[in-house]
């Protein structure tokens, strides 16, 4: 009885996996065989060019001095607003426990 359930479950899983793989292979084959129109090709080429420039520079691409000044100004504002601590670490908070007065309850 248990073996029948296991065989039934394995056949269901096998068929589900095969359908999923057939669907994925069919979609990717169509996507790779599709020719791009000239506008799409230019767009994709520019994105690849930008990616290679960004990886080479290690940061933003084609920035001028005004961008760096704006970045420094915004970082300065953040430091003024949230303290002069390290901006890369999460701040530590210190909360004091409230002081409670003990009030004697009158006996009646």
Swiss-Prot record:
The modification N6-acetyllysine is found at residues 41, 46, 79, 84, 94, 99, 105. GO terms for biological process: proton motive force-driven mitochondrial ATP synthesis. It comes from the Eukaryota. Residues 1-32 form a transit peptide. One of its GO terms (molecular function) is proton-transporting ATP synthase activity, rotational mechanism. InterPro entries: ATP_synth_f6_mt, ATP_synth_f6_sf_mt. The keyword Acetylation applies. The modification N6-succinyllysine is found at residues 84, 94, 99. GO terms for cellular component: mitochondrial inner membrane; mitochondrion; proton-transporting ATP synthase complex. It is found in: Mitochondrion; Mitochondrion inner membrane. The modification Phosphoserine is found at residue 108. Keywords: Acetylation, CF(0), Hydrogen ion transport, Ion transport, Membrane, Mitochondrion, Mitochondrion inner membrane, Phosphoprotein, Transit peptide, Transport. Component of the ATP synthase complex composed at least of ATP5F1A/subunit alpha, ATP5F1B/subunit beta, ATP5MC1/subunit c (homooctomer), MT-ATP6/subunit a, MT-ATP8/subunit 8, ATP5ME/subunit e, ATP5MF/subunit f, ATP5MG/subunit g, ATP5MK/subunit k, ATP5MJ/subunit j, ATP5F1C/subunit gamma, ATP5F1D/subunit delta, ATP5F1E/subunit epsilon, ATP5PF/subunit F6, ATP5PB/subunit b, ATP5PD/subunit d, ATP5PO/subunit OSCP. PANTHER family: ATP SYNTHASE COUPLING FACTOR 6, MITOCHONDRIAL, ATP SYNTHASE-COUPLING FACTOR 6, MITOCHONDRIAL. Subunit F6, of the mitochondrial membrane ATP synthase complex (F(1)F(0) ATP synthase or Complex V) that produces ATP from ADP in the presence of a proton gradient across the membrane which is generated by electron transport complexes of the respiratory chain. ATP synthase complex consist of a soluble F(1) head domain - the catalytic core - and a membrane F(1) domain - the membrane proton channel. These two domains are linked by a central stalk rotating inside the F(1) region and a stationary peripheral stalk. Belongs to the eukaryotic ATPase subunit F6 family. This is ATP synthase peripheral stalk subunit F6, mitochondrial. The lineage of its organism: Eukaryota, Metazoa, Chordata, Craniata, Vertebrata.
């Amino acid at each position: 009885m248990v073996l029948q359930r296991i065989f039934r479950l394995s056949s269901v899983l096998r068929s589900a996996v095969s359908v999923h793989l057939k669907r994925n292979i069919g979609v990717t084959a169509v996507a790779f065989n599709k020719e791009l129109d000239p506008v799409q090709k230019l767009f994709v080429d520019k994105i690849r060019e930008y990616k290679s420039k960004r990886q080479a520079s290690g940061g933003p691409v084609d920035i001028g001095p005004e961008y760096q000044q704006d970045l420094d100004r915004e970082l300065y504002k953040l430091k003024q607003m949230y303290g002069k601590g390290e901006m890369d670490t999460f701040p530590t908070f210190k909360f004091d426990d409230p002081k409670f007065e003990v009030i004697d309850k009158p006996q009646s």
